[in-house]
Amino acid sequence: MAALEKMTFPKKMTFPEKPSHKKYRAALKKEKRKKRRQELARLRDSGLSQEEEEDTFIEEQQLEEEKLLERERERLHEEWLLREQKAQEEFRIKKEKEEAAKKWLEEQERKLKEQWKEQQRKEREEEEQKQQEKKEKEEAVQKMLDQAENDLENSTTWQNPEPPVDFRVMEKDRANCPFYSKTGACRFGDRCSRKHNFPTSSPTLLIKSMFTTFGMEQCRRDDYDPDASLEYSEEETYQQFLDFYEDVLPEFKNVGKVIQFKVSCNLEPHLRGNVYVQYQSEEECQAALSLFNGRWYAGRQLQCEFCPVTRWKMAICGLFEIQQCPRGKHCNFLHVFRNPNNEFWEANRDIYLSSDQTGSSFGKNSERREKMGHHDHYYSRQRGRRNPSPDHTYKRNGESERKKSSHRGKKSHKRTSKSRERHNSPSRGRNRHRSWDQGRRSQSRRSHRSRSQSSSRCRSRGRRKSGNRDRTVQSPQSK
């Protein structure tokens, strides 16, 4: 019945009541405390076994550390062995090198000793050979002297042996340098292919580069510095030459009579500033050389030497005087300063030459003058005058030119006739030059020729006076 009731009347379902939050928290804490107590109990029960495990773990760690240390020690030992082996190898190599260097030094010392001994032996042999040669030479000289004494005792003539046939053949075959013979200087110097005959005695003294100025020193820079020529002028250079002339010429005149004094104004190095002094005799020139050589002037030491120049017409550039030299500053003939008052003008015309040279050149000059035209003859007559002052000659020439220009229209016929008479008659200067040249000959020939020349001179003077009278008479008409 009860089962039937249960089946027919089911039991009413009940749902649990949800606890509150506070209860829930309390139950949770309780559960946690329970679990903690259980854990502590379990740990308390297993406490002894845990200590044993810890001991075994510690022992295992110690064993592991010991193994690691042992392996590290073995590794370090192996590394030390490698380093030691390497060091031993390096030490062995170093030792071998030191031994090799020591052996090489010993070998070098041995070779040097052998070379020194060989050199000493050669020097001894050379010294012995020299002594032997010297002894042989002395014996030969002594033998020659003994032979010479014997020859003298036997009254036989003795002389020095003849030189070899080919001795100085090249020097003899070489031609003389024309520039050195004419100017006493050559631009090639010792490198010249021609022969320079240096005189042992001469009346002309040469002092190289004695006269120097700023313009002459700066001449080399003209090609590279065209403005350098603005710092000096020819007037300043000539004024410096005049001061130099007045300063040094009295010193040269104190030694002897100076018949020529020239200063070169060339710009070439071998002629620049050269001073030429010609004395009347070679003895005076030698005295001047011994006096002035090595002296100091303007901060420079003088270098004096004998000069072969005696004919100044050949040495001085004639085109330079008329400012028509085509070579300019590269000319190898003398470009000289003009002496004040035209001093030593006689030497410029080679009047001071010896009688032999003048006599030998007189025939050639006379033949040449006979072939000269009126124009050349007129200027040669002007050069042959005795007037020592060139200014006076220039003045007279200027006056004659003015007179000729004033009478050019009306007096042309008379001038041509007078010029022909002058051309046919001997000139005054030529007669004087001829009488001076031939005055050193014998007295009879000199007196005879002086009479003939005086008569011709009187005739030429009479003709010139008559020509001057005609000019003075007709000059008022021309005016």
Curated annotation (Swiss-Prot):
**Sequence position, cross-link Glycyl lysine isopeptide (Lys-Gly) (interchain with G-Cter in SUMO2):** K67
Where are stretches of biased composition, namely Basic and acidic residues? Answer: 365-379, 388-403
Residue stretches making up the RRM domain: 203-309
**Basic residues composition-biased segments:** 20-37, 404-417, 442-451
Q: Name one GO molecular function term.
A: zinc ion binding
Task: Give start-end positions of Acidic residues composition bias.
Answer: 50-63
Top-rank taxon of the source lineage equals Eukaryota
Looking up InterPro entries in the UniProt record yields: Nucleotide-bd_a/b_plait_sf, RBD_domain_sf, RRM_dom, RRM_dom_euk, U2AF_small, Znf_CCCH
The segment annotated Disordered runs over 1-63, 356-479
The alphabetical list of record keywords is:
Isopeptide bond, Metal-binding, Nucleus, Phosphoprotein, Repeat, Ribonucleoprotein, RNA-binding, Ubl conjugation, Zinc, Zinc-finger
Q: Where in the cell is it found?
A: Nucleus
Any one GO CC term of this protein is: U2AF complex
Q: Where are the zinc fingers (C3H1-type)?
A: 171-199, 311-338
Phosphoserine: modified positions:
S354, S389
Any one of the GO BP annotations: mRNA splicing, via spliceosome
Looking up PANTHER family in the UniProt record yields:
U2 SNRNP AUXILIARY FACTOR, SMALL SUBUNIT
Name the record gives this protein: U2 small nuclear ribonucleoprotein auxiliary factor 35 kDa subunit-related protein 1
User: What is the name of the gene encoding this protein?
Assistant: ZRSR2P1
